[in-house]
Amino acid sequence: MTIPEKPQGVIWTDAQWQSIYETGQDVLVAAAAGSGKTAVLVERIIQKILRDGIDVDRLLVVTFTNLSAREMKHRVDQRIQEASIADPANAHLKNQRIKIHQAQISTLHSFCLKLIQQHYDVLNIDPNFRTSSEAENILLLEQTIDEVIEQHYDILDPAFIELTEQLSSDRSDDQFRMIIKQLYFFSVANPNPTNWLDQLVTPYEEEAQQAQLIQLLTDLSKVFITAAYDALNKAYDLFSMMDGVDKHLAVIEDERRLMGRVLEGGFIDISYLTGHEFGARLPNVTAKIKEANEMMVDALEDAKLQYKKYKSLIDKVKSDYFSREADDLKADMQQLAPRVKYLARIVKDVMSEFNRKKRSKNILDFSDYEHFALQILTNEDGSPSEIAESYRQHFHEILVDEYQDTNRVQEKILSCIKTGDEHNGNLFMVGDVKQSIYKFRQADPSLFIEKYQRFTLDGDGTGRRIDLSQNFRSRKEVLSTTNYIFKHMMDEQVGEVRYDEAAQLYYGAPYDESDHPVNLKVLVEADQEHSDLTGSEQEAHFIVEQVKDILEHQKVFDMKTGSYRSATYKDIVILERSFGQARNLQQAFKNEDIPFHVNSREGYFEQTEVRLVLSFLRAIDNPLQDIYLVGLMRSVIYQFKEDELAQIRILSPNDDYFYQSIVNYINDEAADAILVDKLKMFLSDIQSYQQYSKDHPVYQLIDKFYNDHYVIQYFSGLIGGRGRRANLYGLFNKAIEFENSSFRGLYQFIRFIDELIERGKDFGEENVVGPNDNVVRMMTIHSSKGLEFPFVIYSGLSKDFNKRDLKQPVILNQQFGLGMDYFDVDKEMAFPSLASVAYKAVAEKKLVSEEMRLVYVALTRAKEQLYLIGRVKNDKSLLELEQLSISGEHIAVNERLTSPNPFHLIYSILSKHQSASIPDDLKFEKDIAQIEDSSRPNVNISIIYFEDVSTETILDNDEYRSVNQLETMQNGNEDVKAQIKHQLDYQYPYVNDTKKPSKQSVSELKRQYETEESGTSYERVRQYRIGFSTYERPKFLSEQGKRKANEIGTLMHTVMQHLPFKKERISEVELHQYIDGLIDKHIIEADTKKDIRMDEIMTFINSELYSIIAEAEQVYRELPFVVNQALVDQLPQGDEDVSIIQGMIDLIFVKDGVHYFVDYKTDAFNRRRGMTDEEIGTQLKNKYKIQMKYYQNTLQTILNKEVKGYLYFFKFGTLQL
């Protein structure tokens, strides 16, 4: 079908129009950031339905997330409705309104699940399977690995013994287990995991593959050796211009001869490189040499710098690539082959046993979804099955969003259900490889890259490629600067794709022509002498200043109206690679009273509040773990001081465990009595919680801990309180999820958490801020993908890349397999193997490439203006970055591969554009006119030196004086000295009042007097009983299950607050109508109606008290009060007390001139056998006598009239006080 001609005036660009209508072959749409790919995808679906008459359920639309799927289905449904309204007689559109609900617009996992549910018989599995929870899956896999390793310990194969010697430590085999897990997850990301594992040994056995790895390293070495030779020659040229440096030149000439031999004939002689020493030490530059070359001081420094660079580049090649002869590297591969083969065997055993366990429990995980789907769709020889053929016949087209984030299993599934080859297929793919940032999810961008390079713009003989390059999001300054940076940063060698004219961004948004340059702000840290703040804290304060400047000076352009409005908090986002800076930023913004939110899902287990709860759980599980026991003791909950812990240990210095020391201290006659009482209370809590944990699930134990110690309330009051509270809820919810698995108990839950920590798996805060809340946001680049903001502050640019994975004993790669060092068991020495060296080099290249893509995502989030924040310790390092070598249009490959952080590259590229002092051979262009408009950067570079006002010296040391110094001074006015001493010695007369709360609720006062009567100290109550306030219920508890008693109490109070009082009384029907009215007004939620105790309310309506209130002259409901406690003087007081009492009285009515108050109680109580109603009434009155007395005295104080009161118990009746 041909593409329809584009009418005049349509909103679509030519490339978008082609993307909507192109058909007849596989299509890959390379959609740059902000190019409207989602709108294009939706429009293509709509035109398939409207123009081509295709039923919506004959389209398979695959999205990356469930949220994306829901949004896309909603947008398609809306468009179908609009079309149906415009053409009500269209039967096809009416059918689509029905079929949209069955439409396959979902994630690939959801599609696979439906496939399994429909064809479970092919798999021979029980159709009543369920999806395992994350907790269950992790623990089951961990259990499986334990069992499989134990089996192999029984066999004790020599290769297994060597493996454990190499990959386990003296203390544990945790590292060995971790490697097995990693291999398992890598393998199941392949269409045939077993085959992938079997091929791991191939490079260790076959010389042909070893030769390929040697060549890979040689090619990479050539990059660094060539750069080293260039640096050496530059050093020689510079020294040649100077006097008195003959010895220096002689050293360099020797090095040049060695390097010439290595590079002889244009090839790298690896044997010569490994067999000789390079980088001889240069003679010192003496004062005489400096004097002789006083006019060339800079050249002298440059010469030394170039020789230093030469040495570092050669050292990298010799240490990272060829630390030994190539033949030795190959020989080690043969020795490692049996170990690699046996490791693959263990992982296959784990896979087999893990699958067996899942089948026995009738559970599936997400990996099963994909592999079972493949099993359904393929025959044993890998060809499409009959079921696959039926899906090929059914689906008119398959549309894949975010194609750059697919893995090889998903690619295989898609290939089974698509029709034709690339030149005549029905697969439509949309994505941007420059935004492929999910390597940790096994995303494989090479799938996109292979098609991008293979498909052509005309689609001749293969698939068709369409480039969507016009950006409708950002101002031209953001786009041109981004283009300039990536034009010189990204290519096939580093970045995996060339950033050429087809890849760059083109301006397409209707902004005005006002100037909005990108701002690169370089913060030079103040040293410890000039600031008490760390470098990170200085950067956080600096960011706040940028935000304040934006709010004060910047405007946001409204493209619809063509007018400006003032910038608000929500217009600003701070992007960072991770959340490491979150707490510093929270503090800095709090200091300036600027609303700020971090939706952190990283570093979760490092948060103070989470560490506290985990220490509690670990201490309850096993109090012999000193770190967690002492951590709990030192926490805000128990508040043991360091000197108290020291006292405990001093009396028992030789105990193995601190718990033993506590017990011994309690029993020691020399122990401090107060500390002993405190310890007894602590141990009593521990034992109580241990007993509780035996009979209750983990989430109830956590809930009890939260309630007992008011954990939620405490952390809610700290900086970032909403996020901290969400973190605590997150842990509680995880315990619920754990409880729903087949595992139970505190020990297993802790093991589950340990596994999450080991895998770096975070599940942090719920999103406590909505998209329209007016706050400054901080988020990671990953979480910002797909979003846009008027002002983007991209900070943390100077934080180094995380290269931890490159230091692991085993390097994994989907394409190449497994790289392992050679470990000599007899000598207990490890050596780099050919595979470990080669795969590490490949991994480093891929890591830097993905970091570049993260930078691209960050830069392209900005609409109005982009701020880049870098930080250096001194400005000398900037000069080095300006001097980075280039190769053609790019920063040299060796510089990019060894770049430590994004700032290293960004500053180097932009400074080369602006600095006039940089030599032409280090610039990309000699004249700005050479740059195309689309990539001509508009950037302001500012270098700011941090100044910390808080540490400025106000007084010299000799200006400080103490009271004692004043007394010893022999001169001066005695009257003035006496007056100063009086001021400094002044004692505040009401110091006791500072130890009491300034405001107390009636409930707190009630509790205080109750505890005093029972012998509990007031300080203890204040420390642990902050005032009753239940924390918000997690979402899953609010939506299902039974409500707690206190929640039902609140609900009943809400109903009673609005209850009408009529002399004729209201009927049960009217009561239901009244409740429905509360729901309609959103006073209460609809799902709460079932928990309202209608019979108890009807009992109250039929009571004498209801009639009395109905006949009253005046009725006041829910009356709050705040009163000075000193005025309420009818209860026993100590010294004059100026505390404030606050409370809420349920109802007050006036009858015959007398004021009465009513307090509703929903308490449940035990009616002991033989107790009369009168005895129960007396018992209930005594329970609330203090609270009621406060209410009565408070009202009498306020009203200056006699006040009487009623208690109404829904489960007992009326009590008059």
Curated annotation (Swiss-Prot):
Pfam families to which the protein is assigned, alphabetical: PDDEXK_1, UvrD-helicase, UvrD_C
Residues that coordinate or bind ATP: 31-38
* Domain UvrD-like helicase C-terminal span(s) in chain numbering: 476-786
Question: What EC identifiers does the entry list?
Answer: 3.1.-.-, 5.6.2.4
One GO biological process term = double-strand break repair via homologous recombination
Question: Keyword annotations for this protein?
Answer: ATP-binding, DNA damage, DNA repair, DNA-binding, Exonuclease, Helicase, Hydrolase, Isomerase, Nuclease, Nucleotide-binding
Against PROSITE patterns, the record matches this protein to:
UVRD_HELICASE_ATP_BIND, UVRD_HELICASE_CTER
Domain of life, per lineage: Bacteria
Record GO terms (molecular function): 3'-5' DNA helicase activity; 3'-5' exonuclease activity; ATP binding; ATP hydrolysis activity; double-stranded DNA binding
The record ties this protein, via InterPro entries, to: AddA (IPR014152), DNA_helicase_UvrD-like_C (IPR014017), DNA_helicase_UvrD/REP (IPR000212), P-loop_NTPase (IPR027417), PDDEXK-like_dom_sf (IPR011604), PDDEXK_AddAB-type (IPR038726), Restrct_endonuc-II-like (IPR011335), UvrD-like_ATP-bd (IPR014016)
Q: Which GO terms describe its cellular component?
A: cytosol; DNA helicase complex
Q: Which reaction does it catalyse?
A: Couples ATP hydrolysis with the unwinding of duplex DNA by translocating in the 3'-5' direction; ATP + H2O = ADP + phosphate + H(+)
Needed cofactors: Mg(2+)
- The UvrD-like helicase ATP-binding domain is annotated at 10-475
Q: What function does the entry list?
A: The heterodimer acts as both an ATP-dependent DNA helicase and an ATP-dependent, dual-direction single-stranded exonuclease. Recognizes the chi site generating a DNA molecule suitable for the initiation of homologous recombination. The AddA nuclease domain is required for chi fragment generation; this subunit has the helicase and 3' -> 5' nuclease activities.
Subunit details:
Heterodimer of AddA and AddB/RexB.
Identify this protein by name. ATP-dependent helicase/nuclease subunit A
Q: Which organism is it from?
A: Staphylococcus aureus (strain MRSA252)
